[in-house]
């Protein structure tokens, strides 16, 4: 598959299908997501992603600015992968996140909540949150910045909803955040 031009930092205007697997790989987000497997279960690595996997590096495929302009949600996915895997974000990738993090405000709040919930739930949560702070991404999360700073220094496990509650109690929360009735009653 190959994608046409992205207009909204999320979805391509057109999608065309190709039999060339390299076209498919080159449109993916991070090198660690570029592996293929053939019918004999042999792993195919066309982008030397094994090196990033072994070195625990999150790196965009090709130009990070282009990848994040195509889909701003990819920036939040980078933090989720840090939280889950304990990997480091490659310097150019992190620099692009820092420069483009304001576009996170254009992502549907429900998608943002899903990615943040997964980030809050990860074993390496604090490492991911520190990357959010370093890249100033936390400043673009509708009032969660102070809570994220606080949580990044906690040495206790929190459920995602508890992390949101901490952020809401500490921060100046925007009314964009949407929770279920059950979650609102807890909050």
Residue ranges, per PLM feature:
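Catalytic cores of the polymerase beta-like nucleotidyltransferase superfamily
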Residues: 1-187
